[in-house]
């Protein structure tokens, strides 16, 4: 039996406490891989990863020795019952296959992303041991599905993507070689401590806004909903670029309009956008398309006209490195209502982009308006804002009651930057052909999946692979809508 690598307990950061206390699952599919050679390589790679980052084998528990604080969590060595659960579980499903991309039906002999393929449940109550992370290797009739389940209080999606990168390095490396990973347990503990230090957490005047953004919601296991479907879509990268170009041609006019009126919704010291990114435009397209589909089916009800978008803070806060594994994310709120300013149409009417026959002018104005507000919100999330957010979270007495607000009618999160398709796990395993993650069953959730650059080659941009959760009537209206249908490569499930 291997000797267990030990580590010192460390407290989770205030930002770690702001994420839902659930387990998230990411699955990689390797076609044609069986357990001959691949299982030992995978096990050796995981063992090597744990030896470099021993806290991955730990558990999340309450931390009782913090004065004037309750609900604080820490990572510590696993209890005896968790030590009996291997880091890599192995199961065989010789009659199951990975779902074909060309079918919308989930047949009985198809490997569904359900609990049997996962190493952990979706939710573990505080009364039971809560591991940091586990893997499960599912050997199917046509390949290997590797599922990683991780505690969202310890990692965000980017951090989990970094773990997969390091696992690939560990699996691919020669067993006798010296492997230099970008981080280790000591660095991770130090960085989480840094996020709680006075040098990072600095108060500012936006405490009221932070309080609204950090409203607490209870996390319970979600009941399965027969009325909500998660549907895959592929949107053309060329169409999104075309839309981006059209929106950017309108941007100077919108900036001039808002800077002239100085709407009460816009701060006086606004950092006006100079350019809209493809992600700004894609997010706006999703928001407008879903709004129109809900409107067409009478599903809007009393929903607010706002969206929440997850924002990775790693590159916005010095000196946090790209490879930091912990949670470092917040949300930006944006109104996606139709433009109310009557002068807008007159101002931009002469702009050639408004006369593209394939894009309705009103839709283009609406999308540009929302993309402008998205970029405006992102520009406001600077280092001062982030330090103020961390100060607000740290100043709360009950850390169990803090949380980033993720309950808007539309919530959009992008993992397009994750390199899962580029990872080489070495001989007998190779590169993943497909990646999937459970996006839950919350109405209005949109997840942009990692870009499959290997499928299109180096000369082309990968299409935007998206999962959208809506009720079936709204989904059908979304597919039938002119602007969304124009952007689609195809419905990725048919």
UniProtKB/Swiss-Prot annotation:
Q: Name one GO cellular component term.
A: cytoplasm
This protein's record includes keyword Transferase: yes
Q: What is this protein called?
A: Fumigaclavine B O-acetyltransferase easN
Concerning PANTHER family, the annotation shows: FAMILY REGULATORY PROTEIN, PUTATIVE (AFU_ORTHOLOGUE AFUA_3G14730)-RELATED (PTHR31896), TRICHOTHECENE 3-O-ACETYLTRANSFERASE (PTHR31896:SF64)
The molecular function terms of the Gene Ontology recorded here are:
acyltransferase activity, transferring groups other than amino-acyl groups
- What is the induction note for this entry? The expression of the ergot alkaloid synthesis cluster which leads to the synthesis of fumigaclavines is positively regulated by the brlA and stuA transcription factors.
One Pfam family in the UniProt entry = TRI-like_N
Per the similarity annotation, which family is this?
A: Belongs to the fumigaclavine B O-acetyltransferase family.
User: Species lineage, top-down?
Assistant: Eukaryota, Fungi, Dikarya, Ascomycota, Pezizomycotina
**Native organism:** Aspergillus fumigatus (strain ATCC MYA-4609 / CBS 101355 / FGSC A1100 / Af293) (Neosartorya fumigata)
> In terms of domain of life, where is this protein from?
Eukaryota
Q: Which InterPro entries match?
A: CAT-like_dom_sf, Sec_Metabolite_Acyltrans, Tri101-like_N
């Amino acid at each position: 039996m291997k000797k267990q690598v030990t580590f010192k307990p460390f407290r989770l950061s205030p930002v770690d406490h702001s994420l839902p206390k659930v387990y998230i699952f990411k699955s990689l599919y390797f076609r044609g891989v069986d357990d001959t050679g691949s299982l030992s390589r995978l096990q050796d790679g995981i063992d090597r990863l744990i030896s470099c980052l021993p806290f991955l084998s730990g558990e999340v528990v309450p931390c009782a020795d913090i004065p004037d604080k309750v609900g604080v969590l820490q990572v510590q060595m696993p209890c005896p019952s968790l030590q009996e659960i291997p880091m890599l579980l192995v199961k065989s499903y010789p009659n199951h296959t990975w779902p074909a991309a060309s079918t919308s039906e989930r047949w009985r002999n198809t490997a569904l992303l359900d609990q049997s393929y996962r190493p952990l449940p979706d939710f573990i109550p505080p009364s039971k041991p809560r591991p940091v992370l586990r893997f499960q290797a599912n050997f199917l009739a046509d390949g290997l599905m590797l599922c990683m389940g991780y505690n969202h209080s310890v990692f965000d999606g980017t951090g989990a993507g970094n773990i997969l990168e390091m696992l690939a390095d560990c699996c691919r490396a020669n067993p006798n070689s010296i492997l230099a990973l970008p981080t280790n347990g000591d660095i991770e503990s130090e960085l989480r401590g840094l996020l709680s230090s006075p040098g990072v957490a600095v108060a500012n005047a936006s405490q009221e806004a932070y309080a609204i953004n950090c409203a607490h919601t209870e996390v319970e296991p979600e009941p399965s909903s027969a009325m909500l479907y998660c549907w895959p879509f592929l949107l053309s990268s060329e169409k999104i670029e075309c839309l981006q170009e059209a929106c950017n041609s309108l941007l100077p006019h919108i900036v001039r309009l808002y800077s002239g009126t100085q709407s009460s919704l816009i701060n006086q010291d606004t950092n006006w956008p100079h350019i809209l990114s493809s992600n700004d435009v894609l997010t706006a397209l999703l928001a407008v398309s879903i709004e129109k589909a809900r409107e067409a089916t009478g599903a809007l009800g009393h929903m607010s006209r706002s969206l929440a978008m997850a924002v990775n803070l790693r590159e916005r806060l010095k000196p946090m490195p790209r490879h930091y594994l912990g949670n470092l994310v917040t949300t930006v709120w944006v109104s996606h209502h139709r433009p109310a300013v009557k002068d807008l149409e007159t101002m931009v009417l002469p702009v050639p982009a408004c006369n593209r026959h394939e894009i309705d002018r009103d839709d283009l104005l609406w999308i540009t308006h929302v993309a402008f507000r998205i970029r405006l919100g992102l520009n406001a999330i600077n280092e001062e804002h982030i330090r103020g957010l961390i100060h607000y979270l740290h100043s709360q007495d009950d850390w169990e009651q803090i949380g980033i607000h993720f309950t808007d009618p539309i919530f959009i999160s992008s993992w397009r930057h994750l390199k899962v398709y580029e990872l080489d796990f070495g001989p007998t395993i190779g590169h993943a052909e497909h990646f999937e993650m459970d996006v839950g069953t919350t109405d209005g959730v949109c997840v942009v999946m990692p870009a499959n650059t290997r499928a299109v080659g180096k000369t082309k941009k990968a299409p935007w692979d998206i999962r959208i959760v809506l009720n079936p009537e709204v989904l059908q209206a979304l597919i039938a809508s002119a602007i969304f249908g124009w952007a689609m490569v195809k419905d990725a499930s048919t």
